[in-house]
């Protein structure tokens, strides 16, 4: 398909509201600032970091996260460590290097990544643009009754301060960078609503001690399900891991063989009022707690787009390249929606594209062409057997390079791809130890000689 690029918008400074001060919001603010736009970042918490701003206190009254407005944004648990080596995670001009007196591990804890984001914020002077303790309640078009897709839309943003003060402001553009690891995605299980014992989603899991001597069923074999199960076996009486497929990777098999109180099961058939959990193979246990590690929903409860951006089975769309609503671009955009890629460099390429579009330095295809591209993408995913709910799961380094080509952003360095793949393969084989034991030292030493680490002028903090 040949895309015909439309005329750029007029070059002038725009007023832009960025929603969220996590990694995607911070890099968006940085790129917009570089292009001379007037930026306001609205952040509901007291500091930067987004998901990486650990919140030890959870909502005990809403253990499954069913309320429209969650009290707690972060889903990070106390022991969480990065699943990718720090070398691959930094932005293009700000390596995530170890610093004296801090967590220097290759796979550091969440606290270290938060400090990296705070350093990034300080070095590039972003804090002055951020309003903390401000929750965005509404985003909608000012001229919403005008159905002309080519008309420039302005956006009303209604926000509420922690004090209760309500503000209404108009912006030229809005960048949604509010994350997607806060609203629990729950399975549908027979008897789930009638089960009287403790049920919670991993969104509110923080430490293992409350589960001491319990029989715990962990539903879901994703990264969090595996990590939390490994942690729980040290304190729980029994841990029963329920998964869609019993064809598990070697690393998880080793963990199960090592821990006699960790058991693997198929999916749950039903939950009984007397505490029994019946699995699809007919086996049954009596549990104290069910912990759902079943992922998260994309939700933007503040956004009113008149149906132009909707969420259907966790597909946010239609979005051109997971970023732009064809009929509202470039004045409404999303940063950070794709998953299963090297996140920070990708967020940066998204932010650069948005900032340059708003400056009039580049253009998008026509609305019709973007819609056709989206349709072609959906059909290709369907042909590959990828469920709609996994629309934004990329798992393809080449996609990041293709995306970068839109704005002339450099491709992912080969060492990033190699180190990331090495970590993935090591985790498959050695789930319990891969963060502390690896066999790619030769690759690592070669990587650390790259100009990214040796020649880049890294501002001090």
Swiss-Prot record:
Keywords: FAD, Flavoprotein, Monooxygenase, NADP, Oxidoreductase. PANTHER family: DIMETHYLANILINE MONOOXYGENASE. Catalyzes the conversion of methylthioalkyl glucosinolates of any chain length into methylsulfinylalkyl glucosinolates. InterPro entries: FAD/NAD-bd_sf, Flavin_mOase, Flavin_mOase-like, FMO-like. Its cofactor is FAD. NADP(+) binds at residues 220-225. One of its GO terms (molecular function) is flavin adenine dinucleotide binding. The keyword Magnesium does not apply. FAD binds at residues 20-25. Disulfide bonds: none annotated. This is Flavin-containing monooxygenase FMO GS-OX-like 8. Belongs to the FMO family. Its EC number is 1.8.-.-. Interacts with EER5.
């Amino acid at each position: 398909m040949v895309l015909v690029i439309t005329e750029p918008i007029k070059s002038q400074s725009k007023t832009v509201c960025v929603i969220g001060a996590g990694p995607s919001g911070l890099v968006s603010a940085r790129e917009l600032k570089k292009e001379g736009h007037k930026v306001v970042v609205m952040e509901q918490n007291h500091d930067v970091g987004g998901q990486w701003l650990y919140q030890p206190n959870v909502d005990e009254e809403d253990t499954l996260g069913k309320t429209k407005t969650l009290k707690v944004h972060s889903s990070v648990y106390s022991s969480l460590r990065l699943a990718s080596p720090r070398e691959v995670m930094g932005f293009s001009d700000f390596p995530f290097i170890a610093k004296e007196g801090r967590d220097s591990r290759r796979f550091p804890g969440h606290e270290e990544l938060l400090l990296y984001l705070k350093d990034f914020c300080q070095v590039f002077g972003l804090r002055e643009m951020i309003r903390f303790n401000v929750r965005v309640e509404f985003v909608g078009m000012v001229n919403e009754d005008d159905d002309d897709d080519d008309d420039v839309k302005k956006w009303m943003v209604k926000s509420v301060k922690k004090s209760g003060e309500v503000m209404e402001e108009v912006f030229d553009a809005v960048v949604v960078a509010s994350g997607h690891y806060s609203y629990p995605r729950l399975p549908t299980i027979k008897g789930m609503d009638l089960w009287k014992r403790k049920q919670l989603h991993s969104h509110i899991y923080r430490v293992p001690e409350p589960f001491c001597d319990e029989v715990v069923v962990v539903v879901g074999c994703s990264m969090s399900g595996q990590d939390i199960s490994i942690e729980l076996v040290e304190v729980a009486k029994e841990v029963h891991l329920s998964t869609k497929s019993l064809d598990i990777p070697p690393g998880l098999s080793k963990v199960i063989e090592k821990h006699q109180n960790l058991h693997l099961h198929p999916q749950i058939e039903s939950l009984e009022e007397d505490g029994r959990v019946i699995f699809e193979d007919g086996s049954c246990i009596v549990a104290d707690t069910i912990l759902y590690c079943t992922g998260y929903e994309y939700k933007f409860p503040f956004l009113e787009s008149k149906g132009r951006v909707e969420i259907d089975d966790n597909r946010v769309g239609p979005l051109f390249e997971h970023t732009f609503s064809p009929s509202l671009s470039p004045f409404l955009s999303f940063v950070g929606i794709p998953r299963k890629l090297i996140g920070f460099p990708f967020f940066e390429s998204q932010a650069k594209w948005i900032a340059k579009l708003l400056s009039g330095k580049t253009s998008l295809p026509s609305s019709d062409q973007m819609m056709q591209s989206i349709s072609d993408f959906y059909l290709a995913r369907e042909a590959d057997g990828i469920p709609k709910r996994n629309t934004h799961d990329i798992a393809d380094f080449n996609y990041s390079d293709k995306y970068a080509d839109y704005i002339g952003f450099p491709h992912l360095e080969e060492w990033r791809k190699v180190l990331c793949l090495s970590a993935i393969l090591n985790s498959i084989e050695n789930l319990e130890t891969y963060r502390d034991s690896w066999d790619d030292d030769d690759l690592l030493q070669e990587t650390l000689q790259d100009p990214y680490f040796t020649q880049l002028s890294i501002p001090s903090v």
